Design a protein with these regions (language model features):
Chain A
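Transition segment at domain starts
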Residues: 22-60
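Activation corresponds to long, low-complexity, non-globular regions
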Residues: 19-32, 142-150
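Noncatalytic modules at the cell exterior or secretory-pathway interfaces
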Residues: 65-67, 105-125
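Sec-dependent bacterial lipoprotein signal peptides
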Residues: 1-19
Length: 150, 489
């Protein structure tokens, strides 16, 4: 006789646990978001992400036609997307925020570039740096350079 | 074998031979002797009484549940701890918090590269499977261990979100590779042997199946002289090694800028008799085929690994073995510059083995295929982490016909089709049709030459992007050696 009640209670508990942290959050003070922009690099950090869905953009002056992205993010749940546009608005890179990875952008027009981050139910840490690359640098975008995450 | 740019003719070169060939294993296991006693039973292996009075403690192995559990845990803790200690990997720093997140947050398809997801994960699953299989459990009782091992790793072994592709590849691929490795390592072992031969056999078996090697050392079985269990030996066994040249091209005539030349080395093992063993225990009959290739680009040296093991069969009509309704479990890994395809699946349908009194024997099969998970190279999906393929389920089928002239040669033709609606990756669908014809001729039963001509058409439909159709071809020319000699009787 107690089985239906126990089952209902179990479902209630499971639902409560499953929905316990379904609140969609935007970036806030708890994420300690920092952007350090300089002539020779840009670094970005936002930590303690817990179910963050948000979109942030900023500008950075790139004196070279390309850049290298040093990924150091760790987002085990959800996604972070990095979109970089050159001085005329052309997309030169669009990539997920990755864990321990180096990639390079396509060539674009030097000048004021825009960096856009899109978070989708992201948990963990967003962290990367951008370094200008001259046009004649040897491209490194190959699977040999990619590191498996596990 | 569900897909192509493989060597289906080579793969089937011996498919029908088991109904013709009896292969003596007397040099491997003295207590097993096969003989052909009459024309009617010429193809049936017969087991003589063992001529050894050695005890056989491994004939009826005891189950060791807690040892198996401990090994399953070790197979998770060791790689986790290794990554944590050697590279301070954040993904390995599991905690109650990460377990809670993995239990409550959504699963995500992961973006590992092709080899990692389609080979390494199934291999790890094979070790989970063998934690049970080498502790006394049979095939069916070992199969859930691949699932449990994979599930616990996804939930508790790493911080990353659990991935459905990992669970499916590790579980199903682990079962297929696991049973294959268990049986191949059994074939390598010989409990009656001594000295250098014994060491070589034990080391080889340990390399093929590390969990088994560990257990044999711990239990003292690695040096204990006893009888080799009869079920460690198939009714027939056949191996072949091919070496040669192949040329790919994304054209119908092997020309054009995309043409690529490779040197390849492939090996095949055909274990058991498709005619007589399909209806016995799972994988009493299986085929495994692997190939290494030069000049294979980012795909790496391993260009092909295909396993097909019999799960069950039912005779059709009164003639035992000649007409059967068969069910197979399959593992597919093909990675070359033209195509990447990996899948875990099942295939089933009628299989005919016809042995006329004169002329070649005939093998015909028509199998439907269902793949719970299939990975296929995408034209648009590419992540920085290295994933360049789409995931979906695979549905299709195919047929093949093979003519075998005993001791002389084989000629065959195959056609396969698979449809893969994309579940994860770039939205769309993939369809692949492959055909191949080929043959091989042996002289003196052991050395041979072969050739195959393969055609591939693929239709890749992408929502919102330009569709991509392919028309590719492949030619293989090779030398072959058969072990034991092909057509031996």
């Amino acid at each position: 006789m107690m089985r239906p009640r126990a089952l209902a209670l179990g479902i209630l508990v499971a639902t409560a646990v499953g929905c316990a942290d379904s609140v969609i959050r935007e970036l806030g003070p708890g994420n300690a978001e920092t952007v350090v922009s300089g002539a020779d690099s840009l670094t970005y950090l936002a930590s303690n992400l817990e179910n963050v869905s948000d979109r942030v953009s900023f500008e950075w002056t790139n004196s070279e036609p390309r850049l290298q992205v040093n990924h150091q993010s760790f987002i085990p749940h959800g996604y972070g997307l990095l979109v970089i546009r050159d001085a005329v608005g052309a997309v030169v890179d669009s990539t997920l925020l990755e864990y321990q990875l180096e990639t390079e952008s396509r060539a674009g027009v030097p000048g004021v570039w825009s960096v856009t981050l899109i978070y989708a139910a992201a948990w963990g840490r967003a962290q990367f740096s951008l370094v200008p690359l001259p046009a004649d640098a040897v491209p490194e975008v190959s699977t040999d350079k990619r590191r498996a995450r596990r | 074998m569900p897909l192509v740019l493989v060597s289906p003719v080579a793969a089937q070169a011996q498919r029908a031979t088991d109904s013709l060939v009896t292969i003596g294993l007397t040099t491997e296991a003295p207590h097993l002797r096969f003989s052909a006693s009459s024309p009617a039973t010429a193809a049936m292996p017969h087991f003589d009484e063992p001529d050894s009075l050695l005890p056989c403690p491994q004939c009826y192995p005891k189950t060791h549940f807690w040892v198996a559990v401990a090994e399953l845990v070790a197979l998770q803790v060791i790689p986790n701890a290794f990554s944590r200690i050697t590279s301070d990997a954040e993904w390995a720093k599991v905690s109650l918090n990460s377990w809670g997140n993995n239990l409550t947050l959504p699963w995500q398809w992961d973006n590992n590269n092709f080899k990692n997801n389609q080979f390494s994960h199934p291999y790890h699953g094979a070790m989970y499977f063998n934690a049970a299989r080498t502790n006394g459990y049979n095939f069916w009782k070992s199969a859930p261990w691949s699932f449990v091992g994979s599930l616990t790793w996804e939930l508790f072994g790493e911080v990353w979100a659990p991935a459905p592709n990992d669970l499916l590849n590790t579980t199903l691929g682990g079962i297929t590779l696991g049973e294959m490795l268990y049986r191949v390592s059994s074939l390598t072992l010989k409990n009656e042997s001594h000295g250098f031969e014994r060491v070589a056999r034990e080391v080889t078996a340990g390399l093929l199946n590390p969990v088994r090697g560990f257990n044999r050392v711990v239990r003292g079985e690695a040096w204990e002289v006893s009888r080799t269990p009869p079920d460690w030996r198939p009714s027939t066994v056949f191996g072949s090694v091919d070496a040669g040249y192949r040329r790919f091209s994304e054209s119908s005539n092997l020309s054009g800028a995309s043409a690529l030349d490779q040197v390849f080395l492939s090996a095949e093992l055909r274990y058991g008799s498709e005619t007589f063993d399909l209806g016995k225990r799972p994988f009493s009959f299986f085929q495994v085929q692997g190939a290494l290739a030069s000049n294979n680009g980012n795909a790496g040296r391993l260009t092909e690994l295909m396993v097909r093991g019999g799960l069950a069969a039912k005779p059709l009509g009164g003639d035992s073995g000649q007409r059967q309704l068969a069910l197979f479990m399959t593992y597919s890994y093909i990675n070359n510059p033209v195509i990447a395809f990996g899948a875990q699946g099942f295939s089933g349908g009628p299989v005919w083995n016809i042995q006329p009194s004169h002329g070649p024997s005939i093998h015909v099969e028509a199998l439907g295929t269902a793949m719970p998970i299939a990975a296929i190279r995408s034209d648009y999906y590419l992540t920085a982490e290295g994933r360049d393929y789409d995931y979906g389920i695979g549905l299709g089928g195919g047929g093949s016909a093979l003519l075998v002239w005993k001791g002389t040669g084989v000629f065959g033709a195959t056609a396969r089709y698979v449809f893969v609606p994309v579940i994860s990756g770039f939205p769309g669908t993939h369809q692949i049709l492959t055909t191949n014809v080929g043959g091989r001729v042996y002289w003196k039963g052991r050395l041979g030459i072969g050739a195959e001509w393969v055609r591939l058409w693929s239709w890749n439909i992408y929502y919102g992007r330009t569709n991509v159709n392919r028309n590719a071809s492949e030619l293989r020319l090779y030398l072959s050696t058969a072990v034991p000699r092909w057509g031996a009787s």
